[in-house]
Swiss-Prot record:
Gene3D superfamilies: Eukaryotic translation initiation factor 3 like domains (1.10.246.60). GO terms for molecular function: translation initiation factor activity. Disulfide bonds: none annotated. The gene is eIF3j. GO terms for cellular component: eukaryotic 43S preinitiation complex; eukaryotic 48S preinitiation complex; eukaryotic translation initiation factor 3 complex. It comes from the Eukaryota. GO terms for biological process: formation of cytoplasmic translation initiation complex; regulation of translational initiation. This is Eukaryotic translation initiation factor 3 subunit J. Residues 47-58 have a biased composition (Basic and acidic residues). It comes from Drosophila ananassae (Fruit fly). Residues 28-46 have a biased composition (Acidic residues). Belongs to the eIF-3 subunit J family.
Amino acid sequence: MADDWESAADSEVVIRPNATNNINKWEGEDDDEDVKESWEDEEEKKDEEKPTKADVPVKTKPNKALKAKLEEQARLEEEEEANRLANLTPEEKLAEKLRLQKIQEESDLKHALDAFGVTSTGGGGLDAFNPESKEEFKEFGASLSWKIAQYKESPHFPQFVEDLVRGLCVNLSATDIKKVKINVETLHSEKLKMEKANAKKPAGKGKGKATLRTENDDIDGYKKYGNDFTDDYDDFM
């Protein structure tokens, strides 16, 4: 009977496998790694999408020593020019005045050519002028004078100017011709004084030199004829 109980006990004993043995303790960690990697990728993309700041140019400080040196140089040049003008004789002052006037005329001519779109080397430049007003005729005359003055070194230039003036005056009335004659005579007188002064040897100030009247600024009337008339123009009429 005891054997029957033992056999019965043995038959009822059922060995169940441990359910926990089949559970993967690393399960789910791969998913965590995938999520982590996706976060890192998103962070990298955000960093790449951030706009980079443009390089700000570095402002260079001006060289104070160089600036001061240039200002001092300009001041010395102005003083030197002022001293030079102060030591000029009346004849030299007149020559300087005419020189500056010529520079101003050339500058005015350049502005006039630019205003009319005319170039000094362009073909048919003077044909582009069609003056109507007084100012336009002045600009046209300045342009003609500039063009003609390019040939002043030619030995035929004096005769050419004489013929040109005579031909132009044919179209004027006697009253207007008289005005032209007065202007030419004034120019002749000034030129004669300058040439005589240049022919003299340098001497002490105020010795043997007549003082010229330089307050006569009425030279606009002969601007269009240039500054190179010969001394015998008082007889051309």
